[in-house]
Amino acid sequence: MENPMVNYSKIIANTASNHYNVRDEYKNNTVEQNVAITMSEQRRFSVGCINITGELNIGMMIRSACLLGAENFYIFGRKKFDKRSTVGAEKYINIVQYNFDDPIHADESINERLEYLLKWNSVVLCEHGGTEIGSHKARLLYKEELENPLFIFGSESHGLPIAVAENPHFYKMSIPQRGVLRSFN
């Protein structure tokens, strides 16, 4: 008998063809039908990440964004991610990648891309020291100022680039950590 953990591409193909990560009521749908359902339930926000080093981490972020109803997922810096951790979510969310030859030293270029996205989005940096999500101030911002928010997360070890973190055109919010775990990783 073949070891099922050896042939990842076979496992991925089998999972996709059987809709294993699709809710039971949608398992008999085509992928196109499920895409249409997902698009009809999306909310007016996007999620992005900058210089995430773990390829599985990017995939898990894509899956989380998709489950929360994001329209888009932006990747700044990495050329690839491990699709195994998306468990099929990459089919149901628009993924935009901005690749840089040297992503670690592309801070100004990333900042310029985010400035460009201000035409369509309110850029919200998720970092320590910002307005706490759930606070009265955050509720007012979300209600009165934020249009199509693009929530940006920094790398696991370095956070957000300084050029991005200090940009006065971007909002800065904090999502307080709960429970006993140290991190998502």
Regions found by a protein language model. Give the residues of each.
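Post-transcriptional modification and biogenesis factors for structured RNAs
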Residues: M1-N185
